[in-house]
Amino acid sequence: LVFNFKTEEDGIQLVTLDSPDQGAYGIAGDVNFISADSVNISFRQIGLSFAGRQQNGIITGICSQGAMKANIELSPGTVELKRPQTPLPPYPYTTKEININNPSDDVILSGTLTLPKDYNTATPVVVMITGSGLQNRDEEIFGHKPFAVIADYLARNGIASFRYDDRGHGKSTGDGTTATTEDFVRDARCVLEYVRMVENFNNVGLLGHSEGATAAFMLGAEPEIKTQDNLCVIDPGKPDFIVAIGAQAVRGDTILIDQSATLLKQGNMPDNIVSDYVEALHNIYDLKITQDDEIAIDSIDAICKNWSNTPIHTALMSNLKKIASDTNPWLNFYIGFSPAESILTTRCPVFVLYGERDIQVKPKLNMPQMQRLAPKAQIKLYPELNHLFQHSQTGAVQEYGTIEETISPEVLQDIADFIISIVH
């Protein structure tokens, strides 16, 4: 456990908790009492508390969570996560900080253009699109910086890239909390157009991870622009190639239902309870898609009328109510959207990558559909890799932070080889 203490300018004491082994970081807590030699803190979100006294630079005390109590010692210092692939200077390439305007949404996208040595207008450029949830330009998670690692590798192999903070996150402006995949597509289009038209690169493609791959296909499927004379002109917002990492090929509700079932099974939940919850969740999502949130909320009791009256069922029903009442635009768009049509009508060269142990976008669920929709695409399944394309034991999210590898070297090489093969 790592307790992070901070004193604000107004003197207010703050504390957060990290549990690297469990992949949990930044859990907000309360400083109940602190003095020169004593501290009492609590974390209501997880029901954990700690009270201790400092002596000879060590804080000794009792950590409690539910019925569990343990004596622990805290030593001052910082925890340095081992991330050997994170790029460190000096770099054999140059970078430029660039702000790109999306005028239709009143958004400024801040990002990094990475340029290999001796680049020119024919140098291929990859615009990177992050997965779901607001993330910075490095797609940083659990101390890993996948997009920074990819940008570094590509630059060392003669390929330029642009990665940017999601709207409303990092240095980018706008509101990302109410944005849907369609909004992120417009952001990516503005970036792609800028790289092609302002930076004057001829070969510009997209690399999308998870939801970012969906956004890439949505751009790839957009029709060519026609002039009044019915002559086709090249749309500067269409990609010349797509790298789709952990790409979904089924409707969003199917992805979320599968994720929920997987998490329940990982928690050793009995099969009958998993089945009850999956069926109910399917019905809730269907009502949200075809009717509205209010009807979904009002239907929960009827949907769950045959459930047993157990604490587990009660907790799961409470979770269903939260989902039904969630009016977030992103969720309501995502559950009803299928990327199938976009994948089917994308005409540029495509490389799709799946991790065998990905439990967030399972290859078993998505890869057959992708193969059917994109028969000309290069599609590859990587043994032992999870959703971040790290070598993993189980693929569980909790493993992400415990793995030193940020992304498989084989994946990096395959991405570079694909791009080089397209432009030469």
Set out the residue ranges of the language-model regions.
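Accessory cap/linker subdomain of secreted extracellular hydrolases
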Residues: 245-342
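Conserved alpha/beta-hydrolase
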Residues: 149-171
